[in-house]
From Swiss-Prot:
GO terms for biological process: regulation of DNA-templated transcription. Residues 18-37 bind DNA. Gene3D superfamilies: 3.40.190.290, Winged helix-like DNA-binding domain superfamily/Winged helix DNA-binding domain. PROSITE patterns: HTH_LYSR. GO terms for molecular function: DNA-binding transcription factor activity; transcription cis-regulatory region binding. Belongs to the LysR transcriptional regulatory family. This is Uncharacterized HTH-type transcriptional regulator YusT. The lineage of its organism: Bacteria, Bacillati, Bacillota, Bacilli, Bacillales. Keywords: DNA-binding, Transcription, Transcription regulation. It comes from Bacillus subtilis (strain 168).
Length: 295
């Protein structure tokens, strides 16, 4: 069993089809198929269940994937450790939520790249649970997540604090009407969605109409058009409020701050590129929250 075969297996498991995996790897499909078949023959077990929609992991495949993630992660860490130098260089894969990418990251990344041009930065966005899983599978060097992290395999560092605010169209006159609207949110696993649903339950709305969106721009556009309400950082939407296109409602004090933390695996090697990146941000607090609360 070679590491290259495990990487092919890992990609097929992730993409769900030979075609997509081959495209991601830059291989021909027949090569990917042959390597999966060779791996199954070597291990004497079926790793994938084939069906019309693609391929899903068998019980043996799920077990192997856990080991493959660890082995590949350790090999990549060894490569980083051996090639690391005092001068930051090489790939640096960072993850963050879309709200963090919109407000906090542009200046931070631009400043970092200006100082360390030999680092190949890449940025992956997604909701908090997606990013946690990516870091745990060694697919990201680190990630900004929208909550406190207590996972036993992860180390977390405070990065930013945001003030979440309920956002509605400017035409919505008050919070009593706002809570009757659908909520526009990311998929399950988003900390802002969880906080919004928690607040709605506290004011008696237990089953809101939920509309899931894939991008921050789509959520803001839907809110502006009067489709529904959402919960977003004040720093993201204050420009829209100043333009008069939306209305903001502060949350009660107990929910008025959300922490953004930067997470890495505890067993990961911290390269010079990652260390200097982590040194480039410090805990930042937003302006003091308004004392008024909803309802």
């Amino acid at each position: 069993m070679e590491s290259g075969d495990l990487r092919v297996f890992q990609m097929v498991a992730r993409e769900g089809t030979i075609t997509k995996a081959a495209l991601q790897l830059g291989y021909v499909q027949s090569n990917v198929t042959a390597r999966i078949q060779q791996l199954e023959a070597e291990l004497g077990t079926t790793l994938f269940l084939r069906h019309n929609r693609g391929m899903t992991l068998s019980a043996s495949g799920k077990l192997l994937l856990d080991y493959a993630n660890k082995i590949i992660g350790l090999l990549d860490e060894a490569s980083k450790a051996l090639s690391s130098s005092a001068e930051p260089s090489g790939p640096l894969m960072i993850g963050c939520t879309q709200t963090t990418a919109a407000v906090r990251l542009p200046k931070l990344l631009a400043s970092y790249y200006e100082e360390h041009p030999n680092v190949q930065l890449s940025l992956t966005t997604g909701h908090t649970q997606f990013l946690l899983d990516k870091v745990l599978r060694y697919e990201l060097d680190g990630a900004f997540i929208g909550c406190e992290c207590h996972h036993p395999e992860l180390e977390s560092y405070p990065a930013f604090e945001e003030e979440p605010v309920v956002v509605s169209a400017a035409s919505v006159p008050d919070v009593e009407e706002a809570i009757t609207k659908p909520i526009l949110v990311y998929s399950t696993g988003c900390s802002y969605r969880e906080t919004l649903e928690k607040w709605l339950r506290s004011v008696g709305v237990t089953q809101p109409v939920i509309m899931e969106f894939g991008t921050l721009e789509a959520i803001i556009g839907g809110v502006t058009a009067g489709l529904g309400i959402s919960l977003l950082p004040r720093t993201v939407v204050q420009k829209h409020e100043a333009e008069g296109s939306i209305r903001l409602y502060p949350l009660p004090e107990a929910l008025s701050q959300m922490k953004t933390e930067f997470i890495v695996r505890k067993d990961s090697f911290i390269s010079s590129a990652l260390r200097t990146f982590m040194d480039s941000f410090t805990p930042v607090k937003t302006a003091e929250s308004q004392k008024s609360s909803l309802l």
